[in-house]
């Protein structure tokens, strides 16, 4: 064991192990402080990179333009309920890189201007910098597009002016928006990870930092917030071509005016179709890019007439002039409503439904009509009352038409064969008696008694005829009495 003095000498030596121990303690403290600093820095960085929760989207459009259906589709719901006044829903936003979620508020204003006062509940002076505006235009009715956009843009401008934002703050918002518009960079082809916006420059000449000046008609109506013009129901382009004889010239003219409007407000333009699910995913990605700064790599699309996409900052007057090269019957400066005319309203022709009239009412009308008509003699009424000049027609000689129809309860009397036999026997007796008379009167007599015989012949002829008539009457009454007795027996 070493002496105590020696141990003290070792510990207290000027260049001994004591100096090394103190150095180790200092290095450990520095490492601990650096560790805590890195942890705090990481926490603060994560806090700053967390998705904000106060972002909002404000949607304007006419009734029936499909704005609620569009936002409901972006939300992921199949069917949305149509509200009144000011509708609210939200979009779920997920950042895969940071594994973070948030909700983006969506406010949809009613198409009736009566409800524009409700904007104060959706946008305030504090929330305006965190707001994205969407103007919805109905492409199935292109004659209403420009008027609708101008109307809703003026409504938004009026509301912003009423909020009484300090001029310094408003100018700052406008300068920031101009810078974002000028800093647009089209993504490189085949580069999926390149951001749409130009990042901070680490090297390069001063010329790269100089922004290009704005054109004459660019950002003349700067609202200080991003604006997006969405044309819905673009699947109706084929219907316009068939039913309203729209040609490529009409579609280019519409697109030209839309792009000019977007240049004035620094807005993006996108054609969509919920029915065909066209450009819906593209619209969602562009919204979260403008709102949360997500990477966006889709360039401008102008080839398809019903799937146009023009991001904010890409367009200019020279690119729009390319559309004017195909104009033959219209000029670029012509008024929109002069060429895109509202078609006349076609009245639908329906088969008129005939209601059955009440029977009594119908009969009363016929009776009143007959009463108003003058009485005119008819052929049927003249026939029975013909004068002496007419043909002597008796009622008993009527044809089959004059025979009255017998009712089911009336029995038809059958002819009796005995009557025919009696008539035949009467004829035989009459001829027999006549032959006898002729023989008696025609017998030869004395010639001198010719005058007496003729006189006697006349008187005797009358007597015989009267006797014959009496005999015939008697014989006629006898068969009738026999028929009557036989019928009485049958009834009994």
Curated annotation (Swiss-Prot):
Record-listed ATP binding positions: 61-68
Top-level taxon of origin: Eukaryota
Any one GO biological process: microtubule cytoskeleton organization
A GO molecular-function annotation: dynein heavy chain binding
Modified residue annotations for Phosphoserine: 194, 383, 391, 443, 446
UniProt modified residues of type Omega-N-methylarginine: 397
Main localization category: cytoplasm
Subcellular location: Cytoplasm, Cytoskeleton
SUPFAM superfamilies with a match to the protein in the record: P-loop containing nucleoside triphosphate hydrolases
Keywords: ATP-binding, Cytoplasm, Cytoskeleton, Dynein, Methylation, Microtubule, Motor protein, Nucleotide-binding, Phosphoprotein, Transport
Region Disordered, residue ranges: 187-206, 371-423, 437-492
Stretches of the chain forming a coiled coil according to its record: none
Protein name, as recorded: Cytoplasmic dynein 1 light intermediate chain 2
Gene that encodes it: DYNC1LI2
């Amino acid at each position: 064991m070493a002496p105590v003095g020696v141990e003290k000498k070792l510990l207290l030596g000027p260049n001994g192990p004591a100096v090394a121990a103190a150095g180790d303690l200092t290095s450990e403290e520095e490492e601990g402080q650096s560790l805590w600093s890195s942890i705090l820095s990481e926490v603060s960085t994560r806090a700053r990179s967390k998705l904000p929760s106060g972002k909002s989207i404000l949607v304007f459009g006419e009734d029936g333009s499909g704005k609620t259906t569009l936002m409901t589709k972006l939300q992921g719901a199949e069917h949305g309920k149509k509200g009144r006044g000011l509708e609210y829903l939200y979009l779920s936003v997920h950042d895969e890189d940071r594994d973070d979620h948030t909700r983006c508020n969506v406010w949809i204003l009613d198409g009736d201007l009566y409800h524009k006062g409700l904007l104060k509940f959706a946008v305030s002076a504090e929330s305006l910098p965190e707001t994205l505006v969407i103007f919805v235009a109905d492409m199935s009715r292109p004659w209403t597009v420009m008027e609708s956009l101008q109307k809703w843009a003026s409504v938004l401008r009026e509301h912003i002016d009423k909020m009484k934002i300090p001029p310094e703050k408003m100018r700052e918002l406008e300068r920031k928006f101009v810078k974002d518009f000028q800093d647009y960079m089209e993504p490189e082809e085949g580069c999926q990870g390149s951001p749409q916006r130009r990042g901070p420059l680490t090297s390069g000449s001063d010329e790269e930092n100089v922004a290009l000046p704005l054109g004459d008609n660019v950002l003349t109506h700067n609202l200080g917030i991003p604006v997006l013009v969405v044309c819905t129901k673009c699947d109706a382009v084929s219907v316009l071509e068939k039913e309203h004889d729209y040609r490529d010239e009409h579609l280019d003219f519409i697109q030209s005016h839309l792009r000019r409007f977007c240049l004035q407000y620094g807005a993006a333009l996108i054609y969509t179709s919920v029915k065909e699910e066209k450009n819906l995913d593209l619209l969602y990605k562009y919204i979260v890019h403008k709102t949360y700064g997500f990477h966006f790599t889709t360039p401008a699309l102008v080839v398809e007439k019903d799937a146009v996409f023009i991001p904010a900052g890409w367009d200019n007057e020279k690119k729009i002039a390319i559309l004017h090269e195909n104009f033959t019957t219209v000029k670029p400066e012509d008024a929109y409503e002069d060429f895109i005319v509202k078609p006349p309203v076609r009245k639908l022709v329906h088969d008129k439904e005939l209601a059955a009239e009440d029977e009594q009412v119908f009969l009363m009308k016929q009776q009143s009509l007959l009463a108003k008509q003058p009485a005119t003699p008819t052929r049927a009424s003249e026939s029975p009352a013909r004068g002496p000049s007419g043909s002597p027609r008796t009622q008993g000689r009527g044809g089959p038409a004059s025979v009255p129809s017998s009712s089911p309860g009336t029995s038809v009397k059958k002819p009796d064969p005995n009557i025919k036999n009696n008539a035949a026997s009467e004829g035989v007796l009459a001829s027999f008696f006549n032959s006898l008379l002729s023989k008696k009167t025609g017998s030869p007599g004395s010639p001198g008694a010719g005058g007496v015989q003729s006189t006697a012949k006349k008187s005797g002829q009358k007597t015989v005829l009267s006797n014959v008539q009496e005999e015939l009457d008697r014989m006629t009454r006898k068969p009738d009495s026999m028929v009557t007795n036989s019928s009485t027996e049958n009834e009994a």
